[in-house]
From Swiss-Prot:
GO terms for cellular component: membrane. InterPro entries: Glyco_trans_19. This is Lipid-A-disaccharide synthase. It catalyses: a lipid X + a UDP-2-N,3-O-bis[(3R)-3-hydroxyacyl]-alpha-D-glucosamine = a lipid A disaccharide + UDP + H(+). Keywords: Glycosyltransferase, Lipid A biosynthesis, Lipid biosynthesis, Lipid metabolism, Transferase. Pathway: Bacterial outer membrane biogenesis; LPS lipid A biosynthesis. The gene is lpxB. It comes from the Bacteria. It comes from Pseudomonas syringae pv. syringae (strain B728a).
Length: 380
């Protein structure tokens, strides 16, 4: 009888904690005596992870913040690698956080430990040479999106497309009436969700632009109402300051982006992961983004993809309008969004097809792929 499995996982932020806990749960169903080590958040700890240190120590955003903590991050990684080599788990699974986990995978694979990376970094879009490090350090890549899997197949990296957990949790048809009732919005009133991003810099660059656009929409459609989910108390305070002196009928929500998307007819949205949520809720959208001019100039030369938004990358065509940098003016955004409030059927038909492709029971698919790599029976 084979010995109980020992699986090491490292997640670096809240989204990875969600993915990791779902994978752990699916693995335990198949092998109840499994043991988990590594680094995880509260959800992974609830599934039985013995975390070597708090996951929050890895949750660092921004170049300046990373540089300020670089010595600590490198020391933690070095100690973690040594601990895992001594423990000799059956497999190591790095969940997202590529700048931290890819190096661990490379060192562990050289030490004879099988490695899996769950959630592809955006190597298909920029810094494509990272795929060389992935090919050397990774026995298996698990991707959430199908076009990522095609890229790795072309690059000779073993890969499995497992689907996206959000596509599993968001229903194919959302309850618009229930969401509106919960927000106190009339069923017949047209509603636009404003989603200028979750980070302070994004809201600073896009918040005023989105409110200028809302004023132009309101001038053409006086019965229009707006909802804006705020990612944190800090973002809410920032948004409230940007709204001062404006007379806009906007309902601010604390979090609850899913409620805002379920309730609305169309979305004005910053490019980012929230566009996938909007797609899964089948809400017509216009994508906008602005960066510092130098940053935009550099990225424009580095990025290999013709599109920036996930809906277009998934559709492999221009399914949703993208207005970037100087093209993102209030007049252009309002003109593009207005017809979608009443009729976004072309977009939503494409969204429905993509949702069905992504809806693959991701956690169970990932668990089966990991167990197949180990030569263990994945069947229940």
């Amino acid at each position: 009888m084979p010995s109980p499995l020992c699986i090491a996982l490292v997640a670096g932020e809240a989204s990875g904690d969600i993915l990791g806990s779902g994978l752990m749960r699916a693995l335990k169903v198949r092998h109840p005596d499994i043991r988990f080590i590594g680094v995880g958040g509260p959800l992974m700890e609830a599934e039985g992870m013995q975390s070597s240190f708090p996951m929050e120590r890895l949750s660092v955003m921004g170049l300046v913040e990373v540089l300020g903590r670089l010595r600590e991050l490198l020391a933690r990684r070095k100690l973690l690698v040594q601990t895992l080599i001594n423990e000799k788990p059956d497999v190591f699974i790095g969940i997202d956080a590529p700048d931290f986990t890819l190096n661990i995978e490379l060192q562990l694979r050289r030490a004879g430990i099988k490695t899996v990376h769950y959630v592809s970094p955006s190597v298909w879009a920029w810094r494509q040479k990272r795929v060389l490090k992935i090919r050397e350090g990774c026995d298996l890549m698990l991707t959430l999106l199908p076009f990522e899997a095609r890229f790795y197949e072309e690059q000779g990296v073993p890969v499995r497309f497992v689907g996206h957990p959000l596509a599993d949790t968001i229903p194919l048809e959302s309850d618009r009436a229930g969401a509106r009732a919960g927000l106190g919005l009339a069923q017949e009133t047209p509603v636009v969700a404003l989603m200028p991003g979750s980070r302070g810099g994004e809201v600073g660059r896009l918040g005023g632009l989105f409110f200028d656009t809302a004023e132009r929409l309101l001038a053409r459609c006086p019965e229009l109402r707006f909802v804006l989910p705020c990612a944190s108390p800090q973002r809410r305070a920032q948004v409230e300051q940007l709204l001062q002196g404006r007379d806009l009928p906007v309902t601010l929500l604390d979090g609850q982006s899913h409620v805002a998307l379920a309730a609305c007819d169309a979305v004005l949205i910053a490019s980012g992961t929230a566009t996938l949520e909007a797609l899964l809720y089948k809400r017509p959208m216009v994508v906008a983004y602005r960066l510092a001019p130098l940053t935009f100039w550099i990225l424009k030369r580095m990025v290999k993809s013709p599109y920036v938004s996930l809906p277009n990358l998934l559709a492999q065509r221009l399914l949703v309008p993208e207005l970037l940098q100087d093209d993102a003016t209030p007049e252009a955004l309002a003109r593009t969004l207005l017809p979608l409030i009443d009729d976004g059927r072309e977009q939503t038909a494409g969204f429905d097809a993509i949702h069905r492709i992504l809806r693959r029971d991701a956690s169970n698919q990932a668990a089966d792929a990991v167990l197949s790599l180990l030569g263990r029976s994945p069947s229940l």
